């Protein structure tokens, strides 16, 4: 990540993931490996062709808190952005996610996006529970707002999940929906 070269294609995690929480204040647990669940692939819910834009987003709950403040991105920032969203370890419900997405539509940003990337839900939820988030994304984005061409990828390895990839805010990225590839096409750092 600290290279001036573009990051390149990001591949789904194949090593597994965990919801196990250890008390890191206990020195004995600091070296203990957590139990991993089998890897689950990213889910490409909709979209065709290739889209490019800047990475913009973060924790859904925090973004919702920022709406209406000076820290909320300017309207122009949403144009063609690849919005990445993830939920916190508090595991907000799919209904909450739907309400926030509807609010994003009401403030005029949802229909400006190039794509939606959704991280594996945070908290200690079972993998079967993750599908409800896919359904609410489809319901709001596709059925309610008619954005059936907006690429949506879910179950990605970022956010309040372990292990997690880091998405550099504001850099250019590309989705190839036909090849199911996610590429960060710009370096997150500049040479001095």
Q: Which residues are covered by each model-predicted region?
A:
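Conserved anion/nucleotide-ligand pocket segment
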Residues: 1-60
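Short acidic (Asp/Glu) and glycine-rich catalytic loops that position anionic groups and cofactors
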Residues: 38-44, 79-81, 115-120
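Oxyanion-binding "anion nests"
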Residues: 54-96
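Generic secondary-structure signature for well-ordered alpha-helical cores
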Residues: 2-11, 65-68, 72, 106-109, ...
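Glycine-rich, charged/polar anion/phosphate-binding loops
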Residues: 49-50, 66-71, 100-103, 159
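C-terminal active-site/capping subdomain that shapes the small-molecule cofactor and substrate pocket
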Residues: 91-192
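Short low-complexity stretches enriched in small and charged residues
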Residues: 34-44, 69-76, 127-131, 137-141
